Amino acid sequence: MLFSPPLQRATLIQRYKRFLADVITPDGTTLTLHCPNTGAMTGCATPGDTVWYSTSENTKRKYPHTWELTETQFGAFICVNTLRANQLTKEAIQENRLPALEGYNILKSEVKYGAERSRIDFMLQADFRPDCYIEVKSVTLAEKENGYFPDAITERGQKHLRELMGVAAAGHRAVVVFAVLHSAITRFSPARHIDIKYAQLLSEAQNKGVEVLAYKAELSAQKMELNEPVPITL
């Protein structure tokens, strides 16, 4: 995924009201960015960090600038735009960069499924193969080289795991993909210290046939690409 037009650089002043952030540009202008991330963003929103933002051509948007990346004072890149996780995963599947998800010729997005009336991020289909249901989660919480999900208690994430267990029980393929969007992370675990219920459900889901995958994105201010498998400890 190439950023076109190129991202612009600024310095973070503060994130507030969850969806907004004030930054100062190199010429001294203060801007308010849209922050497309509902999570705690622990370690991703430290005042003084470098922010990379995109600008929409939609003149009707109240906040035309979107916070895409954080470049920390320690040199790590973090993609804070959670919408990018799905885009990167879709691109990687279509370009056959995720071997575990190859061999399908149909990809559908936002398909309704499950007893709890959810929407799956992706469904893959092919002749003579079970349908493959894929839920994607964005991983940005880092403690040293360890990556964790979630960064706050997530009842929605718990629901998705229950739905995937139902998919597996029905004879379909069920997969959760953790898209690691932090350049310093080298391994992944569920955040048992934050949401014990989610961690327990993830282990239960794996035991009941749900596949748990983690891939790391190559990140820069110019492009992003999801391709590197990450070791998982449940």
From Swiss-Prot:
Residues 201-220 bind DNA. The keyword Transmembrane helix does not apply. InterPro entries: SfsA, SfsA_C, SfsA_N. GO terms for molecular function: DNA binding. Coiled coil: none annotated. Belongs to the SfsA family. Binds to DNA non-specifically. Could be a regulatory factor involved in maltose metabolism. This is Sugar fermentation stimulation protein A. The gene is sfsA.
